[in-house]
């Protein structure tokens, strides 16, 4: 059988929703946002190298010219799809970079938890982070699915593991919590050091006494995972070959979830506890001088993915002055919702402005948020 291959992404996905979306629409959109990161087809004209840290320490990943890849690479930078698309040719699907070979750890690619967080962030504004640990529950906008017990006083990662939670609640209780998983919910385990998202509502099979059958009951998952050097796993789904390390259609029986000590997690928006809100970006500052642009605050209710500032001359020629990417860590610190050029990029920005020829310009900023929308919260005339 001859399989089709994924096609290049021909336009930027935008995850806007109507004024009063249903919870189901939120969930479906979160699944799609994460899946777009896992299934984008790409190639490279030069070797791209990654060196892994953390859970996959010491492994080097190589992406070779002429090879078709699918999905963002596993990388510690943990940035959104829109950062990747900054280097992506939508006509050919090829990534382009400066240099002979590129070490991309700094900003391109994602981890399992980062992928889940950015998928959720397309519709959820309550998150401040997603981590592969137990103590994130009710701490970063992450909530439990079901009523399993956990200790909210635990603040250190190794003090309380998901295996302990499963054992303390018991298999029957955890099965009942797994049974409440809906598409868009996540699972996390400190045993496997992994986080995934369900793409279906749990399929639950009970015996004649109402007890859940752990082998027949299951969820189906998607995830961002790490490859092994030049060996990339291949998966067929819907007639497509996905030549990368993540999974997009992984069958997980409840018995397996229990064995691997997964606990189910979700967000307030996906549970209908707080309302959906349209994305907005504003600029807190006068924004009529370069100094005010540098010192002002870009604010958003959703995580920002990147900010670009431009100088546009009278002929409409646009010069990029500076670019700032935001990663999962920036979401956790709050910088992805409140950012000042003066805090990180003042010197580079001022150097770029100094290089502009004399003339009349419009200085402006474009902000991309996790919904995919692009806002221009500040624009003003500038004479040099």
Where are these regions (language model features)?
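N-terminal capping segments
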Residues: 2-125
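Active-site signature of cysteine proteases
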Residues: 200-273
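Short, compositionally biased P/S/T/A/G/V-rich stretches that sit at domain boundaries
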Residues: 261-293
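Extended low-complexity, serine/threonine- and proline-enriched intrinsically disordered segments
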Residues: 299-324
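Short beta-strand elements
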Residues: 372-384
